[in-house]
Structure formats: structure tokens, C-alpha cells
């Protein structure tokens, strides 16, 4: 998950608004009756200055409620183990940020509060898009185990100038799988811009931690799924899933792919788009936050001036999907200040607070109302809003992490084979064999639940 920083002055302009919001519902003393409560909150690397930004956002809450918040930074490289240890041992903060796909695993540890009796105070399920609300769940364990905090989705970025030179109409290019492929093939006619080589498309490969996020939308668009409906078996080798994966991997040998991108992770491919090496890629909303930032020197001028965003193409089912993720907030059972902890979550769930914090990070708010407000800012933001409305996440099972890793490895193998780097020639049977292997590995993991 990436977050982008907006200048300090922009952050400070939000604080006066936040103060008014916090004051409208605040009480001078905590619900427990204590004169002073200090909550400990774990956050991850939500931008270059995550703690400072968070403290500025929380200042009105602290001032108006008398509740102090000790914001502690826990890096993404260690947060999984630290949250796990805290949930098991009971030596934990009050509130923690958690990645959306991690919530089921953490909830299964029995170290977190069921927030089902509290979430109506912030609008409950109806305040969120379906795919986002799904991230609060754990299959087989009724309850609400987290509250969505901020959201990211993946959708298509493209170069308006390159599409125009190639005679490709963006209004029709992204309508269907067929039109998307045809557009990419037509873009091959533009070999360079201002003397710099450019390729129609680029996406990360096996080194990308989020590779599954990039490919699963095509599986879903073909009518496939990651698991069967009862979550007991893998569905990644179904005919529909095979069709979705193969549509994506077929782009590699079609002459539209910058093959060097397959050796890179997502941030590196983002740099390729900003640097003018590719005309199309699938990325998150944080890139939009950098378009007008002069200090982001990765952008070449012609790319910066011509950024377009479009929805994912409609698949054979007549629908399009995108992956939605982000971060949620969870309350530890061991907290001595659960009421105050949820007051903090209520504050962070207010529409204006959500919108302002999301802008700092270059993400989207988690709630529908501020999402719609962000979507109305411009055409590019609207494309992300539409993506979120059609967003989907993975099955809410505790063992999803290992299953995702198994899929990631096999997806990476397929892309390598498609690029001519595998031990076998690229064909439908090669794709099927890798996906069947992924299914076997996933089924072994699922049988251990």
C-alpha cells in the first residue's frame, strides 16, 4: 500500500475544518469518566511523514475530547508479526491499522473486538461500497472485525497524447476485453515520443508483492473466482479463471508489452509510466496525487500533461471488476479503553476527516459519501470512484495470505513463460498446468484450516 504526501500547508488548511467537526460531537470527559485517557494507535507507513500527518489530523480530536493518542509507527515489513504477537499475548495497543486482506487472519486470532454492536453509530454497512464492507468480515465467524479507514483500487492509466497519435479513441478503447486488446495493438504504431521509445503496455511480474491484485480482475471479469463459494477449495483452475488469466498473459507475446516491466515491482513500473516508457498500465490512485507535484521528478513533461484514467474493460460476463483494498482499523480485546477507542474510530470515520486524510496519502476515503465527493473532482477521479463501486476483494478467510502467495508464484511463472523465459513454450496447456499446480497448493493450505 502506497501513500503520497501533500505539502504541510495543505494539511494545515484541513485542521481548522477538522476542529469544527470534532467539536460538534465531543464531550469534555471520556465515556469511562476518567479525566485523562491515552490511547495507543499503531499505524503503518502512510506517506513520508506518517506520524506527523496523523498527529495533525488527530489534533482537533485530542483537543476537544481530552483523549490523547500516542501514534506509533510500525513498518509494513514487521507489522504482520507484531500485530499477531500483540493479539495473542494481550500486550497490545488499543487500535491498529491493518491491511484489508489481513483482517480475516487477525480476526481469527481471537484477540480483537467484535464491533458489530457499534458500527451503526457510523452508518453501518450501508455507508460503504459492498466490496469495501466485505473486508470487515471473517468467513464462519459472524461479526464486524474492523472498520474501513481508507481505500485504494486498481484501474487503467493511459497517455492521452499517445492514444490520439495512434488514432485510438479512449471512449471506446476500454469498453470490452476485445476493444482493449485492439487498442493496445494499434498503439504499436507509435514507437517513440520526443525521441524516446514507448511501448503500449506494461505491468509488473513475479517480483511484485501485489501481482494477484493485477490479474484477479480479469479472472472475475470472466466469471471466475479465487475460491469456491464455500471457501473450501481453490477455483483458480476453473475454465473461467483460465480464460481470465490467459487473456492477460496473451498480451505479453502480442508485441504490446514492455517485457522489462515483468522483472520489476509495481512502484518501478509506475516510474516507467511517469518516465514515458509505457502508454498504458494498471495502477492505484496515489499516482494522481503526484501529477501536479513539481517535486516528483519521475514525471516527464509529456506524460504529466497527458494522464488519463479509465475503468477496467468489461469481460465476457458483461461486467467489469477491480481489486479494492486499503486499510481498516481494529480494536484489541485487551484494550482498557474500548469506548474511547471507538470514539477515535468514529472521528476518523467522519466524512470530512476521511476525505482530508485520504488526500494527504493519495488514496480514496473508505465511505461512500466522501468517495462520491472525491469522484466529482475531475474525470480522472471519477474513474477511480467508478472502479471502487465495482470493486471486489478476496474471500474473507484466515489463510488467504498463504493462498495468495501460491497464486502469485504461479501467475509469475505464467508471465515468464509468456515472455519466453520459461522452461516450456507458451500455450494454453502451459497456463492450465500452472493454474492446476496453484490450485493443488491452495487446496493443501485450505485443508489445514
Regions found by a protein language model. Name each.
Residues 44, 57, 103-105, 207, ...:
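Extracytoplasmic/periplasmic substrate-binding proteins
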Residues 56-130, 164-175, 271-272, 279-280, ...:
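Extracytoplasmic "Venus flytrap"/periplasmic binding protein-like
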Residues 59, 120, 138-213, 222-263, ...:
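Helix-loop-helix "hinge/cap" segment bordering the ligand-binding cleft or interdomain interface
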Residues 77-81, 89, 194-197, 203-205, ...:
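Extracytoplasmic ligand-binding clamshell segments of periplasmic binding protein
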Amino acid at each position: 500500500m502506497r501513500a503520497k504526501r501533500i505539502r504541510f500547508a495543505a494539511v494545515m488548511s484541513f485542521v481548522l475544518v477538522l476542529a469544527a467537526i470534532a467539536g460538534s460531537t465531543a464531550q469534555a470527559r471520556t465515556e469511562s469518566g476518567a479525566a485523562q485517557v491515552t490511547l495507543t494507535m499503531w499505524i503503518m507507513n502512510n506517506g513520508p511523514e506518517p506520524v506527523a500527518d496523523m498527529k495533525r489530523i488527530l489534533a482537533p480530536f485530542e483537543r476537544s475530547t481530552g483523549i490523547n493518542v500516542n501514534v506509533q509507527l510500525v513498518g509494513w515489513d514487521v507489522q504482520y508479526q507484531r500485530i499477531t504477537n500483540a493479539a495473542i499475548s494481550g500486550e497490545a495497543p488499543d487500535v491498529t491499522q491493518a491491511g484489508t486482506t489481513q483482517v480475516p487472519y487477525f480476526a481469527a486470532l481471537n484477540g480483537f473486538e467484535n464491533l458489530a454492536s457499534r458500527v451503526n453509530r457510523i452508518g453501518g454497512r450501508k455507508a460503504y461500497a459492498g466490496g469495501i464492507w466485505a473486508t470487515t468480515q471473517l468467513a464462519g465467524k459472524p461479526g464486524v472485525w474492523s472498520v474501513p479507514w481508507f481505500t485504494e483500487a486498481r484501474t487503467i492509466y493511459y497517455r492521452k497524447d499517445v492514444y490520439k497519435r495512434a488514432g485510438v479513441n479512449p471512449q471506446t478503447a476500454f469498453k470490452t476485453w476485445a476493444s482493449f486488446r485492439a487498442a493496445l495493438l494499434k498503439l504499436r504504431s507509435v514507437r517513440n515520443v520526443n525521441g524516446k521509445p514507448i511501448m503500449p503496455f506494461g505491468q509488473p511480474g513475479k517480483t511484485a508483492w501485489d501481482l494477484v491484485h493485477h490479474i484477479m480482475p480479469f479472472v472475475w471479469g470472466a466469471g471466475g473466482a479465487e475460491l469456491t463459494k464455500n471457501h473450501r477449495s481453490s477455483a483458480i483452475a476453473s475454465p473461467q479463471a483460465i480464460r481470465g488469466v490467459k487473456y492477460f498473459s496473451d498480451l505479453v507475446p502480442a508485441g504490446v508489452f514492455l517485457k522489462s516491466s515483468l522483472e520489476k515491482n509495481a512502484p518501478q513500473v509506475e516510474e516507467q509510466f511517469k518516465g514515458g516508457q509505457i502508454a498504458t498500465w494498471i495502477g492505484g490512485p496515489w499516482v494522481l496525487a503526484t501529477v501536479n507535484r513539481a517535486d516528483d521528478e519521475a514525471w516527464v513533461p509529456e506524460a504529466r500533461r497527458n494522464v488519463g484514467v479509465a475503468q477496467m474493460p468489461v469481460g465476457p460476463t458483461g461486467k467489469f471488476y477491480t481489486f479494492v483494498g486499503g486499510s481498516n482499523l481494529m480494536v484489541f480485546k485487551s484494550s482498557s479503553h474500548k469506548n474511547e477507542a471507538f470514539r477515535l474510530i468514529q472521528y476518523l470515520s467522519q466524512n470530512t476527516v476521511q476525505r482530508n486524510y485520504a488526500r494527504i496519502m493519495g488514496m480514496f476515503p473508505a465511505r461512500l459519501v466522501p468517495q462520491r465527493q472525491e469522484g466529482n473532482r475531475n474525470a480522472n477521479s471519477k474513474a477511480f470512484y467508478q472502479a471502487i463501486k465495482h470493486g471486489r476483494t478476496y474471500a474473507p478467510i484466515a489463510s488467504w495470505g498463504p493462498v495468495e502467495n501460491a497464486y502469485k508464484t504461479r501467475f509469475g511463472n505464467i508471465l515468464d513463460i509468456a515472455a519466453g523465459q520459461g522452461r516450456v513454450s507458451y500455450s494454453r496447456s502451459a497456463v492450465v498446468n500452472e493454474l492446476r499446480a496453484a490450485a493443488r497448493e491452495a487446496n493443501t493450505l485450505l485443508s489445514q484450516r
